[in-house]
From Swiss-Prot:
Protein known as: F-box/LRR-repeat protein At4g29420
Biological classification of the source: Eukaryota, Viridiplantae, Streptophyta, Embryophyta, Tracheophyta
LRR repeat residue numbers: 59-84, 103-130, 135-160, 181-206, 223-248, 265-289, 318-343, 382-407
SUPFAM superfamilies (UniProt xref): F-box domain, RNI-like
InterPro entries according to UniProt: AUF1-like, F-box-like_dom_sf, F-box_dom, LRR_dom_sf
Keywords assigned: Leucine-rich repeat, Repeat
Domain annotation F-box: ranges: 1-51
Length: 446
């Protein structure tokens, strides 16, 4: 041990992700005990097994006590991650009597006051994942405490808590903010917009308490927003946003003004109130909606999209399923080179093909090079219909060079083999790639 220089030992100790393991290293030798104080990160998770022990007759050191000890035995901490294991997230109030407990209430201001002043000068990253059963009915003022103490904080992540914004002050150095499964007392996100003016990445996952939220950041580059059912009016105004992942249900109004957007994933149930500003550089687009026909027919996503993924999930009405054809998609996105289709979308456009007796009169595009699809076939007789559909696609779109098709893994192997051999023999100019898919499973290429 003495042969290694201290700097190397500090690097080794810094790679230990679990601070409990680091604590055991301290006990192992005086040298490690001394050097471990130079580690700049504290990472502590309350596991399921530790939780069960704390509820048994076995005497264990309280989780908060261990955490405070780790803070006290370290110097110049730059990163802190403390939380409960994901396995505890699914617990219900009936599982254990947690009504009066606070031992895992990690956004408790009084608890945070015990350790935050010690690390405030150097702290750059802070992640707190609370225990929902103890935190959901206790409003926390932790945001005000953090903003008044941590001037150098660059990255903040809070999960599973009820947060107040009273007393929250501006944090000009914060660049990354994640709020996940949070009840937030900021109905329109006004405080969030005002106090984090230089955010570059924003993740709002399952944030409740919102009414008419409006995201307005001049420097934002990436945004992931999963919206609950409650808000009826949503707005994103971010002139420098490059990546957007937005999932919402049925907003009466959705305004998106992000002219520099390059990559977008949009999931929406009802497209009636959706309004987008002009996209100058949008290259990659993924759409998930049962209202797909109206979404792609009524909204302009720009003419620079190269990669498109379409998932029409369950269509609202049978009549709308019949309207969604391949020509409809390619008319809306004439310049795409790559098209990915979900099982439902493949089924919809094949149904449209069969009902119309072909792909339609629209001129085939030469830009489309690759189609990736999860193929739906209900029975053996559908193989011939599917082959006819595929052959028509390949013949009409002459620029198409790659067909990547996955067949459901429960499909009869003979049916699968018949489809593969027929397609490859009748269309030799195309490069074929075959695979299998299953609901909830990973795609497997063969």
């Amino acid at each position: 041990m003495d042969e290694l220089p201290p700097e190397l030992w500090i690097k080794i100790l810094s790679r230990i992700n679990d601070s409990e393991s680091l604590a055991r290293c301290r006990v192992a030798s005086k040298t490690l005990n001394s050097l471990s104080r130079e580690v700049r990160a504290v990472n502590l998770i309350c596991t399921w097994s530790r939780y069960l022990k704390s509820r048994s007759i076995v005497v264990v050191t309280p989780f908060k006590t261990i955490f405070r000890s780790l803070i006290e035995n370290s110097s110049k901490i730059r990163s802190i991650s403390v939380g409960v294991d994901k396995a505890l997230k699914g617990m219900s109030f009936d599982d254990f009597n947690e009504e009066d407990s606070k031992d895992l209430y990690l956004t408790d201001v009084e608890f945070v006051k015990e350790w935050l002043p010690r690390v405030r000068e150097d702290l750059e990253n802070l992640s707190i994942s609370d225990f929902w059963i103890q935190s959901c009915w206790r409003k926390s003022d932790i945001l005000a405490l953090i903003s008044s103490n941590c001037s150098k904080l660059v990255k903040l992540e809070v999960k599973n808590a009820w947060l107040s914004v009273v007393g929250l002050t501006e944090m000009p150095n914060l660049r990354y903010l994640t709020l996940e499964f949070i009840r937030l007392d900021d109905e329109n996100l006004e405080k969030v917009n005002d106090c984090f003016p230089f955010l570059q990445e924003l993740n709002l996952i399952g944030v409740g308490g919102l009414k008419e939220p409006r995201i307005h950041f001049l420097h934002l580059k990436s945004c992931h927003w999963t919206v609950s059912n409650a808000p009826l009016s949503l707005a994103i105004v971010a002139p420098n946003l490059l990546e957007l992942k937005l999932k919402c249900n049925k907003p009466k109004s959705l305004l998106v003004e992000t002219p520099k957007l390059v990559q977008c994933h949009l999931s929406v149930e009802d497209a009636e109130g959706v309004s987008f500003g002009e996209f100058q550089d949008l290259k990659t687009l993924e759409l998930v909606s049962p209202d797909m026909y109206r979404l792609i027919s009524n909204i302009s996503f720009g003419n620079k999209i190269k990669k498109l993924a379409v998932d029409s999930v369950k269509s609202i009405e049978q009549s709308e399923r019949l309207e969604l054809g391949l020509a409809t998609i390619l008319k809306a996105f004439p310049g795409i080179t790559s098209l990915s289709l979900s099982p439902r979308t493949w089924s919809d456009i094949e149904t449209h093909f069969q009902s119309q007796g072909g792909l339609g009169d629209m001129k085939g595009t030469d830009s489309l090079k690759q189609i990736t699809a999860r193929v739906q076939m209900s029975d053996h007789t559908n193989v011939h219909q599917t082959v006819s559909f595929i052959r028509s696609i390949v013949n009409k779109y002459r620029g198409l060079t790659d067909m990547r098709l996955m067949i459901h893994q429960d499909k009869d192997p003979r049916v699968r083999s018949n489809l593969i051999s027929t397609c490859m023999m009748s269309n030799p100019r195309v490069r074929w790639k075959w695979g299998m898919w299953a609901e909830g499973g990973e795609d497997m290429w063969v």
